[in-house]
Amino acid sequence: MGAMLMCMLHTQAHSNVWKYVDENGVTHFTNQPPGKDAQLVIRSDTSALPVTPLIEPQGSPDAAAHRTVAIMHASPAYQAVQSSLTAASVSHGVDYELLKAVVAAESAFNPNAVSHKGAVGLMQLMPATARRYGVQSEPGSSISSKLTDPEINISAGTRYLADLLRLFGGKTELAVAAYNAGEGAVMRAGNRIPNYKETQAYVKKVMAVYRVLQIR
């Protein structure tokens, strides 16, 4: 299935590609819009870098994570932003492997990814969140357009993740949950992972990839 998707992404280079998560928390990519909750990850009018698919077919989450990491490390899209990820990791004190796992889950390393909610870029930042970290609009350049710049996106996203790690006492799973659902949702859940299917699947996915990256 992973090979079939890679073929689709290359042969559909000038078509839109959507990402969606089914009721079992499995991520899929398709060239047909599957519904309102789908996330557009490749636009037909952009020359986006190849994406790293986060497909989790039948099998354990750890097996899927190993597969994801292998594809990621061979991806030109990942290789293009390695230096930016390294710099942000050092500057803001966030584990480099955790950053990689979050970006893989958020955008599959597509800098032009845009969600139906308006989150943009590699780390899928909302413009309001990016504004908190110094990203400002300028004449002819909106915050959303600036967030397609990998360095700007990674810098702001890493600072946000660093703040979440501090807020939740270095508990990685809670910080990851807050990155997906918002810090308020984690606090309302009593500083636990909220009982949202999407968030719970997201945390499992990020942590599985993170564990694999830590031992490689």
Regions found by a protein language model. Give the residues of each.
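Short, cationic interaction patches enriched in Lys/Arg with P/S/T/G and frequent prolines
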Residues: 5-80
